[in-house]
């Protein structure tokens, strides 16, 4: 079970109930590639998505890695605070240690006081057990054989 969770995180796949839920919309979760407004097909939620598609997202799901990673140090799970300039700007949704890439991986929502480029080029910290660890946002999954990225 844990091996499959690690592989899905390495590949950029999200988990329903952790990384995506009714609290987030498809644009915040990086799933806009799965939506097409070109076809004249009505689907559940289409009207709402059309209303918000051009609005600025309030938060963005990102993949982060920790510097100086070791297995289980720290033990990333979910709901750890994400900091930028000593302010909480988000929370993690999933976490694991990737033995294939020798890194701690975490998914997390970062509140959008910043543009996507600013988020991708900024340094963050993730707090685990009252200790902060430097984190870097990945532009694509570690196992980037995927057809999409967050």
Can you name each region flagged by the protein language model?
Residues 1-150:
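Conserved, structured C-terminal
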């Amino acid at each position: 079970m844990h091996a499959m969770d690690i592989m899905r995180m390495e590949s950029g796949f999200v988990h329903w109930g952790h990384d995506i839920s009714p609290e987030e919309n498809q644009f915040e979760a990086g799933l806009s590639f799965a939506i097409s407004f070109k076809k004249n097909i009505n689907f559940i939620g289409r009207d709402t998505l059309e209303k918000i598609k051009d609005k600025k997202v309030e938060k963005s799901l990102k993949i982060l890695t920790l510097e100086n990673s070791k297995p289980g140090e720290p033990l990333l799970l979910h709901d750890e605070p994400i900091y930028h300039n000593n302010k909480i700007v988000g929370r993690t949704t999933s976490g694991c240690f990737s033995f294939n890439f020798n890194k701690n991986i975490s998914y997390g929502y970062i509140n959008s006081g910043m543009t996507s480029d600013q988020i991708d080029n900024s340094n963050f910290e993730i707090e685990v057990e009252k200790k902060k660890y430097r984190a870097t946002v990945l532009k694509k999954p570690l196992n980037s054989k995927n057809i999409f990225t967050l």
